[in-house]
Amino acid sequence: MIKQFQTELAGKTLHVEIGKYAEQASGSCMVRYGDTTVLVNATASKSPREGIDFFPLSVDYEEKLYAVGKIPGGFIKREARPSEKAVLTSRLIDRPIRPLFPKGYRNEVQVIATVMSVDKDYAPDIVAMIGSSIALSISDIPFGGPTGSVNVGLVNGEFVLNPTSDQRAISDIDLVVSGTKDAIMMIESGANEVTEDQMLDALMFAHEEIKTIVAFIEEIVAEVGKPKQEVQLFAIDETLDMEVRVFAKDKIVTAMKTFDKMERNERLDNVKKEILVHFSKQYENELKSIVEVINSIIKEQFRYMITHDKVRPDERALDEIRPITSEVGILPRTHGTGLFTRGQTQVLTVATLGALGEVQILDGLGEEESKRYMHHYNFPPYSVGEAKFLRGPGRREIGHGALAERALLPMVPSQDDFPYAIRLVSEVLSSNGSSSQASVCGSTLALLDAGVPIKDMVAGIAMGLVKENDKIAILSDIQGMEDALGDMDFKVAGTDKGITAIQMDIKIKGIHKDILKDALEQARVGRLHILDKMKKAIDKPRPELSPFAPRVLKMKIHPDKIRDVIGSGGKTINRIIDETGVKIDIDNDGTIFIAAESQEAVEKAIIIIENIIKDPEVGQNYTGKVIKIMNFGAFLEILPGKEGLLHVSNIAHERVNKVEDVLEVGQEIEVKVMEIDQQGKINLSRKALLPKESKAENTKEEKA
C-alpha cells in the first residue's frame, strides 16, 4: 500500500512516499525536499555474521549524475568510485545511527541512499540523512531511533534552518547536526571564527528543529512501521565471564598503569596470552569470548580510573595536554613544511604551491566546479607499529583530511590576494590519538613556512568524555585508548578568536547542553595553550616564498581582448607558453594568472601579452615584420596578432614595380599607421618615414 506523508521544514514541504518503490527492502522511502529527491533503502541479514566482534553496518550514499542532468565523463560513461563528497556524506549518515543499534547485534545492516534529483537550494545530504532514519525506523531492523538531521547557517547574525545556496555562500556557520528527541548524536561544522557561545546556541537551535523531525518520523512509524524482528544478540556465558574476571582483573589493572603506549600494549598483550593459556583447555572453543571479556575488563577499569580516581592511563590531569614540540623548514626542496608532535602523536605536513590551472576539478552534484585549497591526510600502518598492505585512502582518511581542510579554509587568503593553488599533505608518522587535530596544527605551520599569508593561526584539539551514570569526566587531548574506550570524540579547531571547525561522534545515546558547554570551554582553553606552543616555532608567514615555489603574477585585460590572447585554436597562447615556459590561466572577467619557475619568465610573458592587447594608434610608428608579400603590397605584423597592409604605393616615394625588389618575408622595417578603417583594417606607410631623396633601390640594405 502506498502512503504519503508531509511536513513543513524551514518553511518548505518535506514529502515522504512509502510503499511505491523497492518493496523487497526491509525499509524504503522516497524523500523529496524542494526538487531534491533521494531514495533510501535499509536491509539486514536474517542471521548474525559469524566470527566477528563488531556490528557490521555499511552505509553508501550514491551520487547519480543524472540527478543534475550530467553525463559522466571518461570512456566508460558511468559513475565510477564515490566522490569525496559522497564518502563524507556516507559518514554523516553512519555516525548518528550506529550507536542506536542493540549491543551484541551482529547481523549485517546496509543503508543505501541514492540521489535521484538535486535542487541546489535543498541539500541532498540532509534529505538522505532524514531518509535513512525513516527507512530504518519503519523496517523490522532493531533500530533505536528515530533521529532527525538539520543544516544550520548564521546569516547576518541570525540562525537559518537549512539555508539556501545563496545563504550558504554568506553564512558564518555551516553546521550539520543529528540527534534523537532527547539529545544530540552527531555534529559536523565549519565556521568563520564563531565564539563558543554562538556555536552552543546554534546546536540548541538545531536540536529544537530535530525534535520536530523526530515527531514527524514517529507518526510515520505509527502508521506504516513493521514489527521489529526478534534477533539473536551476542552474549558471553556468565560462568566463563565470572571465572575470567576473577583470574584476570588485577593483572589487567597493573598492566594498564603505564605511561608509554607501546609498553602498555605489550604488557596487555602478555597478560592476554597468559589468560588465554590458562583457560585454553577448559574453554578450548571459547577463546574469542575470553578475548571479549578481557576487552570488557580493560574498558571497565579504564572508565573507573577516569570517573572515580580522576586518573588517566598516562597519569595526566583530565584537562592536561601532552608535551608539544613544533618545527618548520624540515625538508629542503619543498615549498613549506611543519612538524607537529604532541605526546606520541606526530604529523609532518607539507605545503605545495601551484598555478591555478592545478586546482582540483570536481565532477559531482554540487555547484562547486573546482577546489583551490586541498588537504590530504595519510595514515600509514607504521604510524601505529603495524605491517599492512598500503591501499588508497579509506573513508577515515578522507574524513580526517576534509576536517583539517575545513579548519584552515576560512584563514586561507582569497585567490585575488594569493593567486596560487595550495595542496597540503599530512603524513602521520606516529599516532596515539588526535592525529587529525595534529594535522590541523601541522597545516598551519606548513602554510606559514611556505609564506602563505593566512589570516590567523589555527590549532585543533580532540576532547573526550567518559560518562558513568551521574559521574562525568571531560578529557582534553585524548590519546588512542581514551578514544577507543570513551564515549565521545569531540574535535574542535580554531584561532584564538573563535571556532573554525567541529566534529563530534559519540557512542552513547546522546549528550546534553551542559556537557557540550563544558567541553567547548575546555577545548578553548586547550586550543589557546597549543597555539602558544606553536608560535614558538613560527608566528607569521615567511616574507618570501620558497625559491623552489612557482612565481605567479596576475594582470587584468578587457574581456574583449581574451580572444586576442588565446588566438585562433589557441595558437597565440601556446606560442607564449612555448617562448617563455610559463603556465597561463584566464578567467572570463579578463583576469590572467601567469605562473613560472622564475620571475623573469613571468615578466617576459606579461610584456608579450601587453603587446598583444595593445591597440595600434593612428599616427604612431611601429617596427613591423613582413609576413606575406602580394602583388599589391605586403602584410606586416606590427604588434603580436596585429597585422596591417603596406600598399605598394606607400613603400617608397619612387614607383615600385615589384614589391619583392624592396621587401622580403621576415624583414623588419619601420612603418607608420596612417588609417584604421571601420572594419579594423590597418593601413601602413613606409614612405611617410623616408626622406624624399631616398632611393627605393637602396632599401634592401635595411633587410634583416
From Swiss-Prot:
NCBIfam families: polynuc_phos, PRK11824.1. It comes from Alkaliphilus metalliredigens (strain QYMF). InterPro entries: ExoRNase_PH_dom1, ExoRNase_PH_dom2, ExoRNase_PH_dom2_sf, KH_dom, KH_dom_type_1, KH_dom_type_1_sf, NA-bd_OB-fold, PNPase. GO terms for biological process: mRNA catabolic process; RNA processing. The keyword Nucleotidyltransferase applies. Keywords: Cytoplasm, Magnesium, Metal-binding, Nucleotidyltransferase, RNA-binding, Transferase. HAMAP family: PNPase. Residues 619-687 form the S1 motif domain. The keyword Magnesium applies. One of its GO terms (cellular component) is cytosol. Belongs to the polyribonucleotide nucleotidyltransferase family. One of its GO terms (molecular function) is RNA binding. Mg(2+) binds at D483, D489. Its EC number is 2.7.7.8. Its cofactor is Mg(2+). Involved in mRNA degradation. Catalyzes the phosphorolysis of single-stranded polyribonucleotides processively in the 3'- to 5'-direction. This is Polyribonucleotide nucleotidyltransferase 4. It catalyses: RNA(n+1) + phosphate = RNA(n) + a ribonucleoside 5'-diphosphate. Residues 550-609 form the KH domain. It is found in: Cytoplasm.
